[in-house]
């Protein structure tokens, strides 16, 4: 494999007229592999040093972290476990550009004016992400993690996963990241819903609703508790609660109102978000939902969640119709 800079205009990869603006893609996946190979016989401290030196030259700040010791630990772990994912990892880089182009073509069928206003990079994420936007050297970029893709998306789920991430880029033009839990519910729910709409008969695997375990099954088994927990924490800015719902962090302990304790699965917020988005889509088109800003989206999300709760005849408190919205509270990377 080799690192490449590709200008992926539609005339080359999609067989259509060239767009007014092109979009850029670059892979650093093989650069990680070269570091892993060239340092395999060295002490780990030296391997980490070579990694840092190499990527500081290739793209300063690509692997920045305020806690240097924590970053070194991630580098060490990534180098140590790389052999276990290598066979699949090696398939990601050659497969990814075509999957990205196909996903872009599919996505523009629903959002014809879409053009990413940020570069797209494929990297070894050191186990931190399969995809997502981030700030690198003061610039907003889309990062795809080849290591996580190798574990979760190397099969038929790759293109729907890319569609999910492209929606986040599109949605960010209208909806800003905000601190409340409902913001993640809305963002991830709409992205998952978009992937489901653009992937007919999509499986839960294609929608990443099976990581780290089957989310739909476990959430449906405790559906009332899941909805009530989400309503209770709708405006929460507590990082541990948001992590519990969306990032595979500690499971929400329980919902312990007037009913028995019911464990909720990690990342269940993605599934609840999908159901909330589908409920909201009964009254508005996907394009209309995408274009709602934060102030307009909050009551729509709250109403959709409330309708799901009422349909299930739940007695717990509905989400508040109004609530404050704050932005950009610092979180631990």
Segments from the language model and where they lie:
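Sec-dependent signal peptide recognition
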Residues: 1-7
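Bacterial Sec-dependent signal peptides at the C-terminal "C-region" and cleavage site
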Residues: 7-20
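Acidic helix-start/capping segments at beta-turn-to-alpha-helix junctions
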Residues: 49-55, 119-129, 212-215, 294-298
């Amino acid at each position: 494999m080799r690192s490449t800079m590709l200008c992926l205009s539609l005339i080359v990869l999609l067989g259509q007229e060239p767009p007014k603006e092109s979009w850029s893609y670059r892979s650093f996946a093989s650069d990680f592999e070269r570091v892993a190979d060239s340092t395999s016989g060295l002490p780990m401290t030296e391997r980490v040093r070579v990694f840092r030196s190499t990527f500081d030259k290739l793209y300063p700040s690509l692997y920045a972290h305020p806690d240097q010791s924590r970053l070194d630990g991630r580098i060490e772990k990534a180098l140590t476990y790389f052999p276990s994912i290598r066979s699949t990892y090696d398939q990601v880089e050659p497969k990814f550009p075509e999957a990205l182009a196909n996903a872009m073509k599919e996505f523009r069928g629903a959002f014809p004016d879409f053009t990413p206003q940020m570069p797209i990079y494929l990297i070894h994420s050191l186990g931190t992400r399969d995809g997502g936007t981030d700030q690198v050297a003061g610039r907003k970029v889309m990062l795809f993690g080849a290591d996580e893709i190798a574990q979760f998306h190397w099969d038929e789920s790759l293109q729907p996963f890319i569609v999910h991430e492209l929606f986040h880029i599109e949605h960010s033009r209208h909806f800003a990241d905000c601190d409340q839990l409902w913001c993640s519910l809305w963002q991830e729910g709409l992205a998952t819903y978009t992937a489901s709409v653009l992937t007919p008969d999509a499986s839960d695997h294609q929608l990443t609703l099976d990581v780290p375990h089957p989310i739909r099954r476990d959430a449906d088994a405790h559906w009332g508790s899941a909805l009530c927990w989400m309503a209770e924490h709708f405006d929460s800015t507590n990082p541990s609660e948001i992590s519990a719902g969306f990032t595979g962090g500690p499971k929400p302990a329980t919902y312990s109102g007037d009913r028995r304790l019911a464990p909720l699965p990690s990342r269940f917020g993605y599934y609840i978000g999908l159901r909330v988005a589908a409920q909201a889509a009964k009254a508005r088109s996907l394009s209309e939902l995408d274009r709602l800003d934060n102030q307009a989206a909050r009551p729509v999300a709250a109403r959709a969640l409330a309708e799901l709760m009422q349909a299930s005849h739940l007695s717990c408190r509905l989400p508040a119709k109004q609530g404050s919205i704050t932005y950009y509270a610092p979180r631990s990377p």
